[in-house]
Structures are given as structure tokens and as C-alpha cells.
Amino acid sequence: MFENLTDKLERSFKILKGEGRITEIIVAETLKEIRRALIDADVNYKVAKSFTDEVKHKALGQDVLKSVKPGQMMNKIVRDELAQLMGGTATDIKLEGNPAVILIAGLQGSGKTTFSGKLASMLKSKKGRQVLLVAGDVYRPAAIDQLKVLGGQIGVEVYTEEGNQNPVEIAENAIKYARQKSYNTVIVDTAGRLAVDEAMMQEITAIKAAVKPSETLFVVDSMTGQDAVNTAKEFNDRLDFDGVVLTKLDGDTRGGAAISIRSVVNKPLKFISSGEKMDSLQVFHPERMADRILGMGDVVALVERAQEQYDEEAARKLKKKLVKDQFNFNDFIEQINQIKKMGNLKDIASMIPGMGKMLKDVDIPDDAFKQTEAIISSMTPAEREKPEIINAKRRERIAKGSGTTMADVNRLMKKFEETRKMMKMVAGGGMKMPRMGRGGVRR
């Protein structure tokens, strides 16, 4: 996400390298490159121009402190202005009324239905809400089926009315049903179209008037770039929505929509979404996104994701095993599963400062752990429990069973030993390593 833009912005800051003061000529040259980078990233031209004008105003005449280089000063100004351009601070979702009604709108294929499921999951798990999903796309049976599947995955009821082709009536009946069943949150998934048309606008406007939502969210596909911004503007002129959701940020997106949309539509970007997993939804934080665009990562988001998967009791048990030198392949595979739950590996890596740039051209597939899991699955329960018994003959059998080579198995065994040592040192506060079990390493 944003790797190309990040790379170009970093190159533009190098113009200031070696300068003792930020001068008008140097600023003009730097901002020319920044503006070009933004436009290449599909940022709206007027937004890019206004942004660089504001940066110029802030930068000119800045005295560079001895401890701060001009490039660092410009980087900070750009970071602050980027955050401001995207909204300044995060905007929370409004959950007013009983039930609180959230209306989801957008074009077909934008990811509305998947987002509806993700939002329901987030509100249920993080805010303790009792959520009802409403299948309001009466024109696409597949959308109704998809919502039912998502609801089943996250344990949320999906309200449908088979045979009823009136989405306004369905939404009204769903709210009555929610009150009867004591649901305090209703998420209405609506029909999309391949393009903005009058019939679509009339329908979504009628649904909004009927259900009086506390929040209307417009979902756009970030991969459509500037078209996403233009579509959002058209919708907002008619629907007057409350916030924007950007989906498919894990795709080949240049980032222009995320940067432009707040300024063009004058509505906050509230959520960003990537991937198909129900937990891959994030509240949009402008400051954090500015950091990621400038290659600074997003350590806060990384810690938050890790905390969501953290099991204190399991961690205590693992620490005991580590200290006693009992860490085995069952524990190893459990740690892999914890990492996988955190989401797309490349997305996680991009949250680590500098890592996104390093992995720009590296393809990290979602099944990156597949070979490791296959090898461990080919071990017997005894081998997983006591790795030290895995001799050459056993390794050969494991390789055949997993469809891998002896070299692959040996690499995994080496990686396992390194992981075991490292985790034991962390658990023991960096204490000196005692010898491993039989067949292990003596120190």
C-alpha cells in the first residue's frame, strides 16, 4: 500500500540534503517533486496544488535547528499537512437511537456486503453491540447469500424477506424486528449499481428517509482511484452521507483516493478495509496513515492488532514451557496461527518503519506458512511433542509425507531451534541458555 508514493516522496526530500536552511528555491524544487508524486498517485490535481501551497507557506522562512536537518523539517511539515488533509483526527461512528441504524451505500463491486459483515463483527466484538444485519439488495440473490454466510461466520443474525422486492419495506420491517428481539444496532446493506443512476439514487434516498439512520456510510473501492472520489462526490450531493469507507487497500492502489476524498467531499474517511477476513477492518486514523505514506510505519496499529489476538492465560502457559525448555512444534504452529490471525503478512510488515519499502517488490502470498504447516502436519504427535527425536530417518519420512525435500525439513528444524532459543531468552529475561534437550546444542 502506497509503496510507490512513499518512494517518490522520500526521493523528493533528498533534494534538501546538505542544505543549512530551507530557502524559496529549494522549497520550490522539492514541492514540484512532491506535487508530481501526488498526481502520479492519482491525487486530485486541485487537492495536490492546495496541499503543496500550504506546505510552502509553512516551510518558507523556517530556521533549521542545529539538531534538525532541512529534510527532516520538511518531512515533518509534509506529515502534519498530510494528516490534516485527510481529516486531522479519527472520527468515530455514531450509534444513536434504539436501535442505532447504519445505512451502507455504494456502487456494485465496491465491497459493501463484505464491509457490512466486517462492521457487524467489529461492533459486536469491540463495542459489545447486539447487531442485526439486513439484506437490502433485492436484485442480487448472491448478495443475500453472501451476507448470510458472513453472518454465520461472525455469529450475527441476517434479516431477509424472501419474495419481497421492496427494499424500503424490508428495511422498515427489519427495524421493527430488531426492537422485538432487543437488537440495539441494525446494519442495512443496500443494492449497488454499475454506475450512478437516477433510479439508484431515488431508492437509497427513500430508504434513508424511511429508516432515519444515525450513520450513513458510503463504500468505495480504493483501486478505482480518482473515480472513487468523483463517485463519492456525486453520491454525497444527493445522499448527504456521514462518512466514507475505503476498501481493497491491499490491492494495487496508488493511494490517491485516501488522500483526496476528505478535501473533495468534505466528509470524514471513517474506515479502511483490506482482504476478505472479517477482522481486517480498521478505524481510519489520518496521523497514522500519514506516517505510513511517508514510510514511518504504523507501530500503534501493529500493537493493537497483536493485543486483539493476545491470550493472557495462553501466554502464561507458553512462558512456563519456554523457561522449562519444553517449547515444541505444537506451540510453534500455535504462534504461526496467532500471526495469521493478525492479517495479511505484507500489510503487517508495512506497519513496521522502513519495512514496507524493503518489501515493495517482494511477493508475500497469503499462504506463506503453507509449507511449514504441511511439514509439521506430517510429523507424528510424538515428534511434534518432542522435536529432539526427529533424526535423519524421520526427517526423510516427513519430507515425503509433506511433499517437500529434506532440505526444506532441515531449514524448518533450524528455524524452529532459532525461534525456541530466542523466545526462551525473552521469557527468561535474557538469561544464559542452558543446554537443549538430547540431540540439542550445548553451550
Model-based region annotation:
Residues 16, 42, 78, 107, ...:
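Residue-level signature of catalytic and energy-coupling elements of molecular machines
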Residues 2-19, 288-443:
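Long amphipathic alpha-helical segments used for membrane anchoring, targeting, substrate engagement
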Residues 8-136, 143-164, 171-190:
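Primarily NTPase-proximal linker/entry elements flanking Walker-type ATP/GTP-binding cores
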Residues 40, 57-60, 83, 87, ...:
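Generic secondary-structure signature for well-ordered alpha-helical cores
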Residues 29, 33, 50, 54, ...:
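Amphipathic alpha-helical interaction segments
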Residues 171-175, 179, 183, 195, ...:
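Conserved phosphate-handling catalytic cores of large alpha/beta enzymes
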Residues 110, 139-141, 165-167, 192-196, ...:
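Short, small-residue-enriched loops and turns at beta-alpha junctions
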